[in-house]
Amino acid sequence: MRVAYVDPFSGASGDMLLGALVDAGVPPEELADRLASALDVDGYRLVVERVVRRGLAGTQVRVIVEAAQPARDWAEIRDLLSASALPPRVKERALAVFRRLAEAEASVHSVPLESVHFHEVGAVDSIVDVVGVVWGFELLGVEEITCGPLPLSRGWVETAHGRLPVPAPATALLLAQAGAPLVPLDIEAELVTPTGAALLVELARFVRPAFLPERVGYGFGTRELPWPNALRLWIGEAFAVPSRLDEAELLLEANLDDMNPQFIEPLVDQLFAAGALDVYLTPIVMKRSRPAVIVSAICRAKDRPVLERVLFEHSTTFGVRGIPIERTKLARRSVAVATRWGEVAVKLKIVQDRIVDAVPEYRDCLAIHQRTGLPIREIWNEAARLAAVWIGQRVGEEDQEATLPE
């Protein structure tokens, strides 16, 4: 799956995201042509520049407005986008971004949603930024967008409502609603704009993904800062990483000195059914010379609650010990051999890509013994002889799931 990771180390705005997308591979001429043909707006042009700021190179995209633009309200922007020739997914996501922003503005200024005037973000430049960013991710084939922590700056910003604190109230509400992670940055400047916040909150999840990076783009803003005023965008392929909980294993133990031994077999069966990787019994002598048994179950850490419940419900114990363990596990394969009396599964033991042993499965041999009455030793020996042809063969990592030659 193709993913994008937004690293807003110096903030986020619509033009910074658009610049990062172009820097990461979106063809600017193609994007400009698509926007011009799909949107019923004019009086603007896209200017794309390669810039170097504070020693870092990237792309700056500016929407140059060449004619006066109205301060559109939410209803006007909704109608404009709904009537556009945008692809359905781009249209839907762009509308969702503006609706989210309109709801935030309505909330912080206590006005009805339909009467929200965007002022700063209602002009054509913000419409082009929002639609361009949504379409840019589509052009790169991105299926999932994630975002890192955003900088929390201070100061004031001049708006149509007057002088307001940074982050602007709508920006602050958007970030709070999304639970976006914030990192304090001691500078008087608006680093995260309402448009940038709405785009990230609507399109992205605030997590760090596991992915194989293919390209990196930098999109620059217009403000001069003591560091590169840029947003970094990673594009790559996602891959699954097992969590620590999935990998961790435990040894659960309980001492039983007052339980009918006949009840231990069903207890062991229940532990295996609940997900135990292995279960074994150890005879011990407890206080007052009582004979007892330790029931030990190896399990994945995530399965601990289920196995503990089995031990408490199906044994007489009042307590269970949990001990973290580490195991070194060899690669193994399971194949089948055809004996004269039926198939027997065989486990192949692999060390450094070489098969070093082939062990018939006892249960299969037992089933044939019970059906035929033959000595189980004879059945096991024939299966082992047939399986011996694999011993010594090499198995490459890429062939672990392939069928070995017979």
Swiss-Prot record:
Keywords: Nickel
MF (Gene Ontology): lyase activity; nickel cation binding
Keyword GTP-binding: no
UniProt xrefs under Gene3D superfamilies: mk0293 like domain, Transcriptional regulatory protein pf0864 domain like
Organism domain of life: Bacteria
Stated family: Belongs to the LarC family.
Protein name: Putative nickel insertion protein
